[in-house]
Swiss-Prot record:
Phosphoserine: residues bearing it: S46, S48
Gene Ontology terms for molecular function: protein kinase activator activity
GO cellular component: cell cortex; cell division site; cell tip; cytoplasm; nucleus
Keyword Transferase among record annotations: no
Keyword Kinase attributed: no
Location of this chain's protein in the cell: Cytoplasm; Cytoplasm, Cell cortex
Compositionally biased spans, kind Low complexity: 23-39
Protein name: Maintenance of ploidy protein mob2
UniProt subunit comment: Interacts with orb6.
UniProt record similarity statement: Belongs to the MOB1/phocein family.
Amino acid sequence: MFLLNSLSRITRGNRSKRHQNLSDASSSSGSFSKKSSTSQLVRTGSPSVEPTALYLQQPFVRTHLVKGNFSTIVSLPRFVDLDEWVALNVYELFTYLNHFYDVFATFCTVKTCPVMSAAANFDYTWLDNNRKPVHLPAPQYIEYVLAWIENRLHDQNVFPTKAGLPFPSNFLVIVKAIYKQMFRIFAHMYYAHYAEILHLSLEAHWNSFFAHFIAFGKEFQLLDKRDTAPLKDLIVVLENQGNI
């Protein structure tokens, strides 16, 4: 909660415009049908030696708002239903990510990010209604993802909030799809906008948030290694530092 509250002053000025965009995106024809809500990872070009990413350099990589290992706070408490615990945490993590993107939306534009990239040779494509992969500017891709997730979170058939409504039998499968898309936003922000994160002095918040996100994903096996490839080096560092 402290993490979310500490962002409130920064996001207040940006939220109105971005949530209008989110509303427009979620109501666009066919954009968020079950058929078109997936996307693909595309490796572009040939492997090459890249300079060390800014987010992997000292002192930034060891800068955290929260000290200690997040595994202690993500594990399932006794007597708590697994689906309830996962639903609560995914909802909160999505809320935090939404607030962070309110800040970053100013920097993530069609001009600065014409494709949704996560590394020099990693681009994400969106699958349209005909299952055809299409390249989208990063802000459009992210708006689509956020709106799609928000629709899922407010679907009583997927995330029930009323007494007596059960979780669907494929609930964890749905959550994995949501988690994968959330990871892609993290990957793009680390790759394309870490300089802006530093400029806003948000690296401690962002690094701790990512460590929390990864720790929860590992605890409940919500991410595959293939999905986390763009940030695998950072995840190894976080493991070695005892953050996750």
